Structures are given as C-alpha cells and as structure tokens.
Amino acid sequence: MTILFISDLHLCPTRPEITTCFLDFMENEAVHAKELYVLGDLFEFWIGDDDNSSFSSLIKNAFTTLTNQGVHCFFIQGNRDFLLNKRFCKETGITLLADHTVIDVDGKKVLIMHGDTLCIDDVKYQEFRAKVHQPWLQWIFNRIPLFIRQHIVKNVQDKIKEKKQHKTLSIMDVTQSEVERVMHEEGVNLLIHGHTHRPDTHSFTVNDNQMTRIVLGDWYTQGSILTYKDNTFTLLNKSFK
C-alpha cells in the first residue's frame, strides 16, 4: 500500500515548469497510490470554485482522471486556496477534509494539516486568517464578479510579498509549544504538515513520549513528495524535466 502527501505546489499559469512536474506526478506516481493527500496551497491563489479558466480546468481534469482510476484523493485548504470548496471537490471527486484531521495509516493515528495554524508567533497573520475564514465574508466575496476578485487577489498578493520581506524566518515557522499542544489534544505522536517550505523530519520527546513532525517541501524548484510504503515514511524530490 502506498500513500502520498504533497503541499505547497503554488500552481499558477506563470510557472509552467511546476504544472508540468505536477501533471507528470499525477500520471506516473499518484496513479499507483491508494491515497493522495494534498495539504494545502495547491494553487498560488484560488479565487473561487467558479473559476473555469483553461488553467483551472487542466488541474481539475488531472484530479478527475486520478479519482476515476480509483485513487482516493483528499484536500485540506491552505492559506492560498482556502476558497477551494465543495464545488471543486464534487467536480473532481476529491474529499475535502477539516483543517486538522486525524487519519489512520496502518492502524496508526496521524494528524495532518496545512500548518499555518501552528505559526502562532505571527500574530498579524493569525488575525488576518481569522478574518478571511469568516463564512459571511467568504459568502460575500464569492458573489463578487470573477474579474473583480482577480484584481482584489492581485493586490493582496503584492501586500503579502511586501510584508514577508519584513518578517523574520523564526516568526514564519511553527511554534513548538503549539505543535506539542495540538498533538496532545488530538492524541497523536505523528504530525504531517506543509506551509513552512522547510522539508524535514523532527523528533522530540514530550512527557517521555516520542513524537515526530514531518514537514513537506514546496515545489518551487523541484517536486516534493512524502511517501508511505512498507511501514516507512520517506521524503522524496522529483526533478523538473
């Protein structure tokens, strides 16, 4: 049994090399898996499930093809695609999961998430996140004409890039105490997440319990895939062709 985990692809029309790598992954690796988990930021930005552009259709078709072949696909919203919702999932056969979800992997409880909720030292981001996740605000935004939403998102992108330049690397990483709190709350000793773009496996001890946190990588310069096979988790890279 093979299970695959990916995140932080940031797919967009202006980075065709990432899209090509992703489509190759779907056709040659994902097709042989039992399950595929996408832990957020599949897209650079997702402005709504009514986006029927040729680019979004290309990505939708890749998932539809995969799910039609019997691969179970799951998605957790990231900070760039939190508007990806039920319509997209219905069209593609993907199952939308809660922000924090515990799954069963060969009898072992594993907590999966995007990871942005763990970065609690970034207070301004957490305040922004709380605002944009309000259902009433999303309801209003989704009813704004698509071309206006595109303009709004472009302005938000520019502001995010500007603010990031003034943030320290530490404030954009997870807060260890929050990691431990959430893992204890969910009753797990293994956590898998993305968001920070710092692929690694972290081991630590809490109250004599061995804990593990696996961080997925981004797809800016190569693909990053976490595989589970033969009772082992392995972080792999996939080169751009």
Swiss-Prot record:
Alphabetic keyword roster: Cell inner membrane, Cell membrane, Hydrolase, Lipid A biosynthesis, Lipid biosynthesis, Lipid metabolism, Manganese, Membrane, Metal-binding
GO biological process: lipid A biosynthetic process
Binding site for Mn(2+) 1: D8, H10, D41, H197
Cofactor(s) needed for function: Mn(2+)
GO MF annotation list: manganese ion binding; UDP-2,3-diacylglucosamine hydrolase activity
Pathway: Glycolipid biosynthesis; lipid IV(A) biosynthesis; lipid IV(A) from (3R)-3-hydroxytetradecanoyl-[acyl-carrier-protein] and UDP-N-acetyl-alpha-D-glucosamine: step 4/6
Catalytic activities: UDP-2-N,3-O-bis[(3R)-3-hydroxytetradecanoyl]-alpha-D-glucosamine + H2O = 2-N,3-O-bis[(3R)-3-hydroxytetradecanoyl]-alpha-D-glucosaminyl 1-phosphate + UMP + 2 H(+)
Cofactor note: Binds 2 Mn(2+) ions per subunit in a binuclear metal center.
One Pfam family of this chain: Metallophos
Enzyme Commission identifier(s): 3.6.1.54
Principal location class: membrane
Family under the similarity heading: Belongs to the LpxH family.
Function: Hydrolyzes the pyrophosphate bond of UDP-2,3-diacylglucosamine to yield 2,3-diacylglucosamine 1-phosphate (lipid X) and UMP by catalyzing the attack of water at the alpha-P atom. Involved in the biosynthesis of lipid A, a phosphorylated glycolipid that anchors the lipopolysaccharide to the outer membrane of the cell.
Name of the protein this chain belongs to: UDP-2,3-diacylglucosamine hydrolase
